[in-house]
Swiss-Prot record:
HAMAP family: WecG_RffM (MF_01001). Pathway: Bacterial outer membrane biogenesis; enterobacterial common antigen biosynthesis. Its EC number is 2.4.1.180. Catalyzes the synthesis of Und-PP-GlcNAc-ManNAcA (Lipid II), the second lipid-linked intermediate involved in enterobacterial common antigen (ECA) synthesis. This is UDP-N-acetyl-D-mannosaminuronic acid transferase. One of its GO terms (molecular function) is lipopolysaccharide N-acetylmannosaminouronosyltransferase activity. The keyword Flavoprotein does not apply. Keywords: Glycosyltransferase, Transferase. It catalyses: UDP-N-acetyl-alpha-D-mannosaminouronate + N-acetyl-alpha-D-glucosaminyl-di-trans,octa-cis-undecaprenyl diphosphate = beta-D-ManNAcA-(1->4)-alpha-D-GlcNAc-di-trans,octa-cis-undecaprenyl diphosphate + UDP + H(+). It is an enzyme of class 2 (transferase). Pfam families: Glyco_tran_WecG.
Amino acid sequence: MNNNTTAPTYTLRGLQLIGWRDMQHALDYLFADGQLKQGTLVAINAEKMLTIEDNAEVRELINAAEFKYADGISVVRSVRKKYPQAQVSRVAGADLWEELMARAGKEGTPVFLVGGKPEVLAQTETKLRNQWNVNIVGSQDGYFKPEQRQALFERIHASGAQIVTVAMGSPKQEIFMRDCRLVHPDALYMGVGGTYDVFTGHVKRAPKIWQTLGLEWLYRLLSQPSRIKRQLRLLRYLRWHYTGNL
């Protein structure tokens, strides 16, 4: 029988990733023995791997995060290629966030939300409360001034939040989480990018069949042709993968 409260780690280009078999494994790992882990969750996909390679500051930020997991199918395939016996699957960050919120609602875990447009954040709060009775102890949209950051950190600390999710895009959200943890270390932090927009229906996610086939990137490209430059950049990652430079 597999022990869901532990997980192996795998290394890709110097970055250590947690190998979760599936979503249930991820949740059992994060809530091991009924105790929510503390630290920072960072989703890793091919685009982020490239950014890490090119930006030393981002690499340092992400290396410092305790829980780095494979959010992109390309990263999962690379892990499986380098480690043929690895039982690792993609855990999409948006799905993990929803499952965490559902679990938090069930257990009464205090949650603080950061980021997003004011109206999107308000809709996110309402939906979380209505859908899972999430105990939201505070929130802040993404439109605050740099000089307001410290006061926000103090608000988060005073709220007693055990889960803090930050939707500011990378690397802003990783910088925010690193700095906030200096004031409020006893929590699980999660960078969630555009998840609030997807959750509230402002952004349409790829249909399940596209996700299952590992073609979510193609769906996004067809929906937003302006992404072509970003997608072409990923050819570099494919070269790493197919030449075994992992």
